[in-house]
A protein has these predicted regions:
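NTP-dependent nucleotidyl-transfer catalytic core
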Residues: 1-175
Length: 175
């Protein structure tokens, strides 16, 4: 997924730059949400496999073979020290390891494509900074967001969809 966006973004940035606009090529590192936990757990499964254990990739994990060398690297780095630890003990370290390993792959892909980023921005750096809360406060004060429930997805049956209240942006009123 990141490659397609990088190619499109780089082409667009090049066109804008050629047209005289000042352009900053920024890569947004999606390292702050639950998907990083899923990635770390998936690497942990591959790590267990590296020790000959049989594992099952349940729904919500990533079974991709691209995780095998990452797990082997983890095995070389920490040995068997995670095998008998609880998830609470290994997950925080493995989250960081997973993000670093994926960013190494992404940077390698970008280099192969000849795409140079000016900056890399970590989503995680926003947490605890107060910036998210401040932005939501400004949007709320200006009447641009509200609490509501989305309609069910159209065009396909979803057995797992449940209505839930969430913060929504008033996009229909603002273009």
């Amino acid at each position: 997924g990141h490659t397609r966006g990088a190619v499109f973004g780089d082409a667009l940035a090049s066109l804008l730059s050629y047209s005289g606009f000042e352009v900053t090529r920024e890569y947004y590192i999606n390292d702050g949400g639950a998907q990083v936990d899923v990635l770390a757990r998936s690497i942990f499964l591959r790590y267990q496999e590296a020790f000959g254990r049989k594992v099952v990739f349940v729904d919500g994990t990533y079974p991709g073979d691209y995780l095998i060398p990452i797990a082997i690297g983890l095995k070389e780095k920490v040995g068997d020290s995670y095998l008998n630890k609880s998830e609470d003990e290994w997950l925080p370290e493995l989250r960081d390891y997973a993000v670093d390993a994926m960013m190494d792959l992404i940077r390698s892909d970008l280099d192969l494509l000849g795409i140079k980023m000016d900056t890399f921005f970590s989503e995680k750096s926003l947490y605890g900074s107060g910036q998210i809360e401040a932005a939501l406060g400004r949007l709320r004060d200006n009447g641009l967001i509200y609490k509501g429930v989305l309609e069910p997805p159209k065009g396909k049956k979803t057995d797992d969809w449940e209505p839930r209240e969430q913060t929504l942006f008033k996009s229909t009123e603002h273009g």
